């Protein structure tokens, strides 16, 4: 797995005090460890931006809920990647079905984000990312114990996906 870039702390000055703001990756890691699934953790790391677009935190959590475990624990596309795409679509997606150029541009963005994730982690498929870990497709999620968190890379994958999207959004601010 790539080096952890999400531990960087961003400092902002406001009047005479310095406020440390966590990266989106740090937020996603914490959210996953609070019990949100991988897709929800990445999505909710961008809750403020989504709320500014009229998507409440609760709605965002609900929209992302199906993508955990590689789409309902089917172990297909990693939920972190799905969350990243979901947020990108909400913030930068196209809405006109006839806008072919906008659709193409958006698909290109998503492919670039997914390629970056794959380059940093070796895959974007859940069962491949969890190689060597029980990846059954039973719909019953495992209990979130300390052992669960130690054996799975999911918290770090959520951090990685959120950091990739955060960099993308900063680079593409309009």
Spans of features found by a protein language model:
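Active-site-proximal helix-loop elements at catalytic-domain edges
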Residues: 24-52
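Acidic-glycine-rich active-site phosphate/pyrophosphate-binding loop
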Residues: 10-21, 43-66, 135-139
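Amphipathic alpha-helical interface segments
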Residues: 39, 44-49, 87-88, 98-174
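A short glycine/serine-rich beta->alpha loop
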Residues: 26-33, 67-75, 146-151
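Short, contiguous, pocket-lining structural segments
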Residues: 34-38, 55, 76, 153, ...
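FAD-binding core of FAD-dependent oxidoreductases
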Residues: 75-85
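Polybasic, low-complexity association/targeting segments
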Residues: 2-34
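DPxDG-like acidic metal-binding loop motif
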Residues: 83-93
């Amino acid at each position: 797995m790539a080096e952890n870039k999400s531990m960087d702390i961003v400092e902002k000055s406001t009047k005479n005090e310095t406020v440390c703001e966590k990266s989106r990756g740090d937020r996603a890691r914490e959210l996953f460890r609070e019990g949100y699934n991988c897709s929800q953790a990445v999505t909710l790391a961008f809750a403020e931006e989504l709320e500014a677009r009229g998507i409440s935190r609760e709605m965002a959590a609900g929209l992302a809920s199906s993508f955990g475990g590689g789409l309902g624990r089917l172990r297909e596309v990693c939920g972190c990647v799905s969350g990243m795409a979901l947020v990108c679509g909400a913030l930068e997606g196209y809405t006109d079905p006839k806008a072919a150029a906008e659709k193409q541009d958006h698909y290109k963005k998503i492919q670039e984000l997914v390629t970056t994730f794959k380059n940093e982690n070796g895959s974007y498929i859940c069962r491949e990312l969890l190689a060597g870990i029980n990846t059954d497709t039973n719909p019953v999620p495992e209990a979130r114990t300390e052992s669960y968190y130690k054996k799975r890379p999911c918290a770090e994958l959520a951090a990685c996906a959120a950091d990739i999207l955060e960099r993308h959004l900063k680079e593409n601010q309009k």
